[in-house]
């Protein structure tokens, strides 16, 4: 099971995401990095063994500029990147920013053109809020995606809360698909990681528990990492 640390980018700095209230995100404070400089945060992740990181460009998602220069500069680790793709134009825009081993995220929260789910070399984010998938049914999504496209179960309302993962939701999605499944939002401790591992989850996205020192990134990568 991969451990994929997260960076939320806003106004060129790393911020602490909580419950999807993006206007209220504050500069990141972390036990593993003294700076909210996203380059330094990414380096701290890599130094502790991370092979892939998740980046969300909150400015582009909110229609208020972008952080593409920062994303390009983080070229020393593989990335999966969410810019809130709505259209093919958005997808082509972010692909130009990424390296060949990076992947663009297509997320149900923002997607307008469901045909984009058929693209190769993407990651699809199943964005849930309070247990409900945003904008599409799961069957609609699964009828479009390629068999090898990873699916992120992202509980937006749980991001940054450390209130734990939704085991029933994870089981529900796993029962419906053989695609690789990632889980993000609300990881509170080792028990959540063990639960995801035992269920057969392929990767976990995590930030808050690492930055607060609840989980040691190097330790959990050594324990669960593939």
Curated annotation (Swiss-Prot):
Gene Ontology biological process: L-histidine biosynthetic process
Gene3D superfamilies: Aldolase class I (3.20.20.70)
A Pfam family the protein falls into: His_biosynth
GO molecular function, one term: 1-(5-phosphoribosyl)-5-[(5-phosphoribosylamino)methylideneamino]imidazole-4-carboxamide isomerase activity
InterPro entries in the cross-refs: Aldolase_TIM, His_biosynth, HisA/F-archaeal, Isoase_HisA-like, RibuloseP-bd_barrel
Domain of life, per lineage: Archaea
Gene Ontology CC entries for this record: cytoplasm
Family of this protein: Belongs to the HisA/HisF family.
Name of the protein: Uncharacterized protein MJ0703
Native source organism of the sequence: Methanocaldococcus jannaschii (strain ATCC 43067 / DSM 2661 / JAL-1 / JCM 10045 / NBRC 100440)
Top-level taxonomy: Archaea, Methanobacteriati, Methanobacteriota, Methanomada group, Methanococci
